[in-house]
Amino acid sequence: MNVLLCSINTLKRLYDISAVEVGQHFYWQIGSFQVHAQVLITSWVVIALLLVSAILIIRNLQTIPAFGQNFFEYVLEFIRDVSKTQIGEEYGPWVPFIGTLFLFIFVSNWSGALLPWKIIQLPHGELAAPTNDINTTVALALLTSIAYFYAGLSKKGLAYFNKYIQPTPILLPINILEDFTKPLSLSFRLFGNILADELVVVVLVSLVPLVVPIPVMFLGLFTSGIQALIFATLAAAYIGESMEGHH
């Protein structure tokens, strides 16, 4: 009997873990529309962190940089290198866009692990990292799509559309489909990795709430940074591709 009760309790615990979900949505009702307030609030927090950090650094620039200025200069140099490698010699105007994507995604991903969002009490639902919501990642992917369309059209004009029938008109449907798969792959890759990371941490904390989840959390911080780099690199590559016309 004791063995049976133990087995039932174990199965019940596993069932509870299988139902784990990361966060509940917090909505604002605006007319007949429901807005994901969770995403807006946490995105504003991330944007505020970036703006405040930038203002504090640039208001007192020095010839011999201190730690903060030196760190930001290193980040800027890194983003320039990524942009130049993927876009080419005309990378200059696109550094702010690529840098904004990278920093926003990077800080958003890390905020999910480092900021105690769940401490903030809401009427219903709870806060989580912005990139933990598919709406954020799809919006970032659509911005990237608009950017590479603009890059191609601004450089080549209507001749940009010749790429859809190169090297042969038979590939027209595939080339059109590619414009839909690019934002889909960008958005779902980022969303899936961040969501999976948070789910793994939640499940491990439920099973072993002490030391074991800590290495996984550090691994999550590393993969979060890698995901930000991948997104920014692919965005720059798509922009460079649209300007050069290569597939």
UniProtKB/Swiss-Prot annotation:
Gene3D superfamilies: ATP synthase, F0 complex, subunit A (1.20.120.220)
Membrane spanning stretches: 38-58, 95-115, 134-154, 199-219, 220-240
GO molecular function: proton-transporting ATP synthase activity, rotational mechanism
Pfam families: ATP-synt_A
Record flagged with keyword Plastid: yes
Subcellular location: Plastid, Chloroplast thylakoid membrane
GO cellular component, as recorded: chloroplast thylakoid membrane; plasma membrane; proton-transporting ATP synthase complex
Primary role: Key component of the proton channel; it plays a direct role in the translocation of protons across the membrane.
Family to which the UniProt record says this protein belongs: Belongs to the ATPase A chain family.
Protein known as: ATP synthase subunit a, chloroplastic
Organism annotation: Glycine max (Soybean)
UniProt gene name: atpI
